[in-house]
Amino acid sequence: MTYQKIILAGGNGYLGSLLAKHFSNEAEQVIILARKPKAQIGNIKTIVWDGKTVGTWVSEMENADLLINLCGKNVNCRYTPKNQEEIINSRVLPTRLLGNVIKDLMAPPKLWINMSSATIYRHAEDHAQDEYTGEIGYGFSIDVCKAWERSFFENELPQTRMVTLRMGIALGRTDGAFPRLLNLVKLGLGGRQGDGKQYVNWVHEQDAVLTIEWLLNHKEINGIINCTAPDAVTNEVLMRTIRKAYGIPFGIPTPAWLLAIGAKIIGTETELILKSRWVKPAVLLDNGFEFQYSKIEEAVHDILSLRI
């Protein structure tokens, strides 16, 4: 095995499941820290924690090659005061807890990757935002990211390399955004959303996983990393690409006012669809990371080839 131990805090979600499966073939142990117990599957073991207090899970942190913190309440909800508090606390509290625990370990994780979101950048239709010159936006989603990253970088951990991964929208067949977009296409509703000019910072799920392993093996890299495909596309292009690949010739567009009504009905926010996220993974590209799926057409065709 290449690695001794991989730890996934909050690793029962979409991306965590992908990482657990991938690293189960690369590591002796994969440890998932989760709120609910789960039977061990092969070398993947779940240990219960609440993300707020220390417990028996702390000993598992010793000698880990990699700790990935994936904790966070789903933002696909209405931004009520209660939900806003839960969204922030579910990210900040586990991050601070992990930092405090790592400080006292004899053999702390070699690399700690903390998730963040590429939505931290401003609404951008004029040019791409990268790690060097990107402009931070404003609003609740950005405040969440700023608090999340601040709670991460407030730690001084000389024995642990630290990376915050500003994730784009991971696209895959089984979960995440793609199945929902595909359902709209199947219903004939796969036209542009709003004016369709807003950019979507996507990344194929395989590239998201490979980025994390690449970071594990490139010890000179730390700090802020954008995890998005290099070829961002507009919402209109994304929807047209899915329609064409699936063989649906048309798609009824959804104007912004109708999206606002629909968002209230299903309990979400239009910002998740209408904000233009044009983000470039400059650090990955500058340091030689090679995307398997850099073009949206390649990614969509691959995902749709995985018929279930």
Predicted features by range, described:
Residues 150-173:
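Conserved beta-loop-beta element that borders a ligand/cofactor-binding pocket
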Residues 96-138:
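Conserved Rossmann-fold NAD(P)-dependent oxidoreductase catalytic core, especially the SDR/UDP-sugar
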Residues 1, 250, 271-308:
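C-terminal amphipathic/interface module of NAD(P)-dependent oxidoreductases
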